[in-house]
Curated annotation (Swiss-Prot):
UniProt similarity note: Belongs to the UPF0758 family.
PANTHER family tied to this protein: DNA REPAIR PROTEIN RADC, UPF0758 PROTEIN YEES-RELATED
This protein's name: UPF0758 protein Gura_4138
Binding-site positions, Zn(2+): H177, H179, D190
Gene3D superfamilies: 5' to 3' exonuclease, C-terminal subdomain (1.10.150.20), Cytidine Deaminase, domain 2 (3.40.140.10)
A GO molecular-function annotation: metal ion binding
Organism this protein belongs to: Geotalea uraniireducens (strain Rf4) (Geobacter uraniireducens)
GO biological processes: proteolysis
Amino acid sequence: MSGGIKQWPEDERPREKLLKRGAKALSDAELLALIIGTGDSSSGRSALDIGREMLQDFGGLRNLAHATASEICRIKGAGPAKAACIKAALELANRYGARRFESLERFTSPSQVFEHFHHEFRDHRKEYFLTLLLDGKNRILKRVQISEGSLNQSIVHPREVFNQAVRESAAAIILVHNHPTGDPTPSREDIDITRRLREAGDLLGIKVLDHIIIGDGSFLSFVDRGMM
């Protein structure tokens, strides 16, 4: 559909469609168009055209979220103001996911952890390993990042993992890390690290409840798989 969005039939305009049918009725490109706001008068391209080009050039929302403002500005019609609006909207989405997790009183299932962390990790190209510290009633005390980059036993050392747990008087911990490849299948290194940390936790009286690997749209729980 050509021409400015204002010239389109009302039912096809992203803003009117959202108000009438709800945000879920809109495509990713239409939601981006609302954030972008205006098109490019010099080329006659609408905000929706620009949104579609962004998704195509970056290969989807995941890569767009990882792009810098300057990279977004390379799209014709997307200047610094539009790039800033897009980065702000994506950051708000990330913060919303984080707040939902922080409001949880206690850990009840691996899927809870996945629901939070897949939003946070999906844009990362590196592996991140962190721990969730829990009290005796499985209430979340704190999250602690242990390492960034490829996992190995020299980086994910029991001393680093349990240092904060001891300081916070944690009764248990949950291990969490991501696989940037998107496949949550554990490597031999993942399995060995989990065994080593579980043994160290037993000696310290701090139970390792689970190790959850976050993939792209899926996760693996060591406990659910009977691996610990």
